[in-house]
């Protein structure tokens, strides 16, 4: 594979029977969970395929990437108000009123609730689900793969920013691809005059400092 089109047309890896069984079970459960939100279901399955392809391209475990993609928007079955209420019940603290960051909470809530339901899912998958909306100062390759896949999967519109990220697939390192996607997301929020979580600013500053130290700029 050399680019975005190859990523999205990749052949499924040769998973073992247990892995195929869990993938099928999670996909079926997701279809039930998001039965009333077909667009979200289609997006989730598309992210799973994109994440799997990116993982194959960048040397990340494609099985874990596929699982993370399937599960990342699980809590989107709930309304924003219900996600906020559930986050409060779980004691999630974002440092600000949770209603201000409602769009960021679904991954965090899922990562807290779903491990008990699916204990066979590796913990690093749950971490990727947790940070797929917020990012974090320390992002594993799996975290980066899910974050990027969520933004560039083919059902997303062909905006200049998304197309720019798609064009980088395979021609730049995963860390640089993630960085462009992360910064593009911040720009999108700012252009829309929406609330930018202070934690995002902190993550940006820490990642930027780390890239500067590494000579990436």
Each language-model region and where it sits:
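Generic N-terminal amphipathic, Lys/Arg-enriched alpha-helix
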Residues: 2-36
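Intrinsic-disorder-associated interaction segments
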Residues: 12-19, 171, 175, 193
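C-terminal beta-signal and terminal closure region of outer-membrane beta-barrel proteins
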Residues: 182-185
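Charged phosphate-binding loop/patch that engages nucleotide di/tri-phosphates or the phosphate backbone
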Residues: 187-217
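Divalent metal-dependent catalytic cores for phosphoryl transfer on phosphate-bearing substrates
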Residues: 28-34, 43, 52, 56-179
């Amino acid at each position: 594979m050399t680019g975005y089109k190859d990523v999205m047309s990749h052949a499924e890896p040769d998973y073992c029977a247990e892995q195929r069984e869990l993938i099928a079970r999670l996909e079926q459960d997701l279809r039930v969970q998001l039965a009333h939100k077909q667009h979200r279901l289609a997006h989730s399955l598309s992210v799973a395929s994109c994440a799997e392809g990116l993982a194959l391209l960048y040397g990340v475990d494609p099985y874990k990437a596929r699982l993370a993609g399937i599960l990342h928007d699980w809590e989107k079955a709930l309304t924003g108000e219900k996600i906020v209420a559930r986050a409060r019940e779980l004691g999630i603290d974002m440092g600000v009123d949770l209603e201000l960051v409602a769009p960021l909470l679904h991954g965090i809530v899922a990562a807290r609730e779903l491990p008990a339901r699916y204990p066979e899912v590796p913990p690093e998958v749950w971490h990727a689900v947790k940070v797929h909306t917020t990012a974090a100062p320390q992002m594993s390759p799996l975290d980066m793969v899910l974050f990027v896949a969520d933004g560039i999967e083919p059902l997303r519109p062909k905006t200049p920013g998304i197309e720019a990220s798609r064009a980088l697939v395979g021609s730049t390192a995963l860390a640089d691809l993630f960085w462009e996607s992360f910064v593009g997301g911040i720009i999108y929020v700012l252009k829309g005059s929406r609330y930018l979580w202070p934690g995002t600013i902190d993550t940006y500053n820490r990642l930027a400092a780390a890239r500067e130290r590494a000579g990436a700029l």
